Amino acid sequence: MQLNPSEISELIKSKIEGLSVTSEFRTQGTIVSLTDGIVRVHGLSDVMQGEMLEFPGGTYGLALNLERDSVGAVILGAYEHLTEGDIVKCTGRVLEVPVGEALLGRVVNALGQPIDGKGPVAAQGMEPIEKIAPGVISRKSVDQPMQTGLKSVDSMVPIGRGQRELIIGDRQTGKTAVAIDAIINQKGEDMICIYVAIGQKASSIANVVRKLEEVGAMAYTIVVVASASESAAMQYIAPYSGCTMGEYFRDKGQDALIVYDDLTKQAWAYRQISLLLRRPPGREAYPGDVFYLHSRLLERAARVNADYVEKATGGKVKGKTGSLTALPIIETQAGDVTAFVPTNVISITDGQIFLESDLFNAGIRPAINAGVSVSRVGGAAQTKVIKKLGGGIRLALAQYRELAAFAQFASDLDEATRKQLERGKMATELMKQAQYATLKVSEMALTLFALNKGYFDDVDIKRALAFESALKSHVRSHHAAILDKIETTKELDAETEKALEAAIQEFKQNGIY
């Protein structure tokens, strides 16, 4: 077979035309030092702040310090296989995590990778962990309640959808218990929950996941884990990853709740990273931008208007508002709320639930200090019936605390003071609630109504909780229609009041408690 020159030239021409050459331009550098998960890389001339860097063996890192002749980065994951002189590549991408409904019911790490042994996650997409919070015009005022199912919280420090409410207290005062109860109470409320565990023992996290599975709460919950055994870098990015997962639902016109447990550990991790990166230390050895660390995270929790949702979904969702409610947890040392991180987060959030060791040890659980705890915006969102009935509870408890201190020194008390003390004692007793025993609005309203109307006045304080439990059972069994009406309307009209009074009087006359 012979080929003439014209055929050869045509063949070569067709081959050249069909040739696909893909070139990839990526800056490369080399590791010059590696210490405690912090690397210094030389030669990355056009790296971005917060860019993902690719190390040998499929390991990734995060560029944090951009200096004149080197880049300081943290490694995300194992780094035992890395050595000085290894090649590092820029990726041109910032750190992203998977988002979407597929994550519900899953336990993932700070990078969104599943760690529950249930196989890969078929995510709806990838989103950057660092995002700019919605602007002023995009926001809507908080006016819808987020019920926690806890009498003391919903009556005294109500939380609204889109609010940031801090839970603060010493270790072992029940901070996580309040947050987990809030998650459990969202069952059937069309609320997506994200629980971010930072720097906790793996056994504690396993117990939380087990409990959420038992009560059927994992169906609407995502658990993001950066346990105490993981690197400081993973503990630092975990809250941002969880927030991005929550924002996906907020921007679709849904309601989401995120718990950061706890941000003190994140601040410690960030301090560790900053000191290893040789950033100048400030107060309590924290870096200068520790306030920004938490403010840029918590400002992303908001209630957004329908225009924002429509724009975010490309016009697919119209006329719906979305919200992301945040419950950050801060651990104090010996009740000191004037320390650096607690004061920062108190100033960023819309109120705080302050838990006290003394109250906890006295058996008052949740151990909420009514005088110091406050909700700055939740009042506008509070359920009408609870607002009407619970208005005097907080004042009664605060006055009781004050009077109780004086009563220790006074030998004889006048009738009015004695009554106030008795009412305060009873209110304190009735605010007690077992863990995982969340209440419906109607059940809460029943207790508050009976307390306000004086039906507990002749009950022995030691029998108060048993009386309350028996009363609820009686009304639920014989007058379920009253509770159903309160649950549906979330209001208490004159007719319902009369019916409730009659039901309570009937119960007291029978005396079955």
Curated annotation (Swiss-Prot):
EC number(s) per entry: 7.1.2.2
GO cellular component: plasma membrane; proton-transporting ATP synthase complex
Binding locations of ATP: G169, D170, R171, Q172, T173, G174, K175, T176
EC supergroup of this enzyme: translocase
Subunit note: F-type ATPases have 2 components, CF(1) - the catalytic core - and CF(0) - the membrane proton channel. CF(1) has five subunits: alpha(3), beta(3), gamma(1), delta(1), epsilon(1). CF(0) has three main subunits: a(1), b(2) and c(9-12). The alpha and beta chains form an alternating ring which encloses part of the gamma chain. CF(1) is attached to CF(0) by a central stalk formed by the gamma and epsilon chains, while a peripheral stalk is formed by the delta and b chains.
Function field: Produces ATP from ADP in the presence of a proton gradient across the membrane. The alpha chain is a regulatory subunit.
Organism of derivation: Nitrosomonas eutropha (strain DSM 101675 / C91 / Nm57)
Bilayer topology annotation: Peripheral membrane protein
Localisation per UniProt entry: Cell inner membrane
Annotated keywords: ATP synthesis, ATP-binding, Cell inner membrane, Cell membrane, CF(1), Hydrogen ion transport, Ion transport, Membrane, Nucleotide-binding, Translocase, Transport
GO molecular function: ADP binding; ATP binding; proton-transporting ATP synthase activity, rotational mechanism
Residues the record marks as site: Required for activity: S373
Catalytic activity: ATP + H2O + 4 H(+)(in) = ADP + phosphate + 5 H(+)(out)
Main location: membrane
Family of the protein in this entry: Belongs to the ATPase alpha/beta chains family.
Alphabetized NCBIfam families for the sequence: atpA, PRK13343.1
Pfam families named in the record: ATP-synt_ab, ATP-synt_ab_C, ATP-synt_ab_N
Alphabetized Gene3D superfamilies for the sequence: 2.40.30.20, ATP synthase alpha/beta chain, C-terminal domain, P-loop containing nucleotide triphosphate hydrolases
InterPro entries in alphabetical order: ATP_synth_asu-like_sf, ATP_synth_asu_C, ATP_synth_asu_C_sf, ATP_synth_F1_a_nt-bd_dom, ATP_synth_F1_asu, ATPase_a/bsu_AS, ATPase_F1/V1/A1_a/bsu_N, ATPase_F1/V1/A1_a/bsu_N_sf
Protein name per the record: ATP synthase subunit alpha 1
